[in-house]
A protein has these predicted regions:
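N-terminal membrane-targeting hydrophobic helices
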Residues: 1-198
Length: 198
C-alpha cells in the first residue's frame, strides 16, 4: 500500500474506530510510516529533487530502484523495518514489562501497532517487490496474488477499493462532524434572542 494509506487507515482505526484518542491516532499514523522512511531517504539521496519534478520517471534504472529499496544502507534498513521480527519483539517488551501501565494514552502501543499493520499489509499486497517477513531469522518471501500498484495483479482494482474506502471514511467523518455541530446548536439556548425583563 502507499505510505499515506497505511497512515490514514491506522489513524482512522485508532482515533475513530476503537476511540483510543487523538494522540494515539497520530502515533499510529507515525508508526505506520516507519517502514518506508528508508526508501524516502534513499530517494532523496540517489535521485534528489528530480523526483519532485519527474516522479517515477526520474528513477531510470532497475539498479537505482534496487539500491533504494533492497540493497545498500537504505534497502537493508527498509528490509529490517518491513520484517515483523523487530516490531513483534518490541510489542513483546511492551507486554512483558507492563509498559501499558505507563502508556495510559496508548501512544507507544499505537505507534507499534501502526508499524506492525504496515508490515502485514505490505506482506499481503506486494507481488514483485517482496521482503522477508521474518528477517533475520528466515529469508522466506511470499509473492502475493494482489499488488497495490501493478495492474497485472489487480493493482487498479486495489487502488479503487482502497482510495474509495478512504473517501468513504472521510465523508462519514465530515458528515458526523456536521451533524454533531447542528445538534449542539439546537441544544444550546439561542443567546441572540433578548428575553423580556421579569
Amino acid at each position: 500500500m502507499e505510505t499515506y494509506s497505511h497512515a490514514f487507515f491506522t489513524w482512522a482505526l485508532a482515533k475513530h474506530g476503537v476511540k483510543a484518542g487523538r494522540a494515539a491516532g497520530i502515533a499510529g499514523a507515525a508508526g505506520a510510516t516507519v517502514p518506508d522512511l528508508p526508501s524516502f531517504a534513499g530517494t532523496a539521496y540517489y535521485v534528489g529533487t528530480a523526483y519532485l519534478w519527474e516522479g517515477w520517471s526520474s528513477m531510470h534504472s532497475e539498479e537505482l530502484l534496487d539500491e533504494i529499496y533492497f540493497h545498500g544502507p537504505f534497502g537493508a534498513t527498509g528490509s529490517a523495518l518491513h520484517s515483523a521480527m523487530p516490531v513483534v519483539a518490541l510489542l513483546l517488551v511492551y507486554w512483558v514489562f507492563g509498559l501499558g501501565r505507563r502508556d495510559r494514552r496508548r501512544i507507544l502501543l499505537w505507534f507499534l501497532l501502526g508499524w506492525f499493520g504496515h508490515t502485514i499489509a505490505d506482506f499481503l499486497t506486494h507481488v514483485d517487490d517482496t521482503r522477508p517477513l521474518l528477517w533475520p531469522i528466515w529469508d522466506w518471501e511470499w509473492s502475493s496474488p494482489v499488488s497495490y500498484y501493478n495492474r497485472l495483479y489487480y493493482g487498479r482494482e486495489f487502488f479503487i477499493v482502497s482510495h474509495g474506502l478512504m473517501l468513504l471514511i472521510i465523508s462519514w467523518l465530515l458528515l458526523k462532524r456536521i451533524v454533531g455541530q447542528k445538534r449542539r446548536r439546537t441544544l444550546l439556548p439561542d443567546r441572540s434572542v433578548k428575553r423580556p425583563p421579569a
